[in-house]
């Protein structure tokens, strides 16, 4: 079968990624190195995207604003704070104070837009992959997670939906009791949803 590229080289320039250390094992991905190197490449691709296809990007942002705005703001804030969890950010941003959040978004608009661009590129590649696999008669099975991560845009943007303490950390955490798999049980650490009558 002919290999298909999903990297959309219209926004990626070879010289921007060919010299990065992605690892040299042909049998296994080195995710540590990929994680460390990807930011520079994605930032360059995002900056080029703004020049090449702004209308498609803007349409994507409008269509997905319900989740994209919070996600991009969260990821930009996380980057600006050196990867620290949101519970360690300054109080105004941690509590999503409207004035402080607006100030951050204005001062870091480039970071926010880059995060939106990365999502746009991902979804464009994902749709290309889905179209290709459908032509090949291959079905992709999705896995819906049952919990969200504590340090996530979901919890940061919607703390009222979770059982959290005053510092934003889980008051109750997900896990399982001891069983045949683990004598000690498992503590996953994911925050539990705050179920109310409106959730049912």
Question: What is the role of each PLM region?
Answer:
Residues 7-15, 195-200:
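Conserved small/polar residues in nucleotide/adenosyl-binding loops
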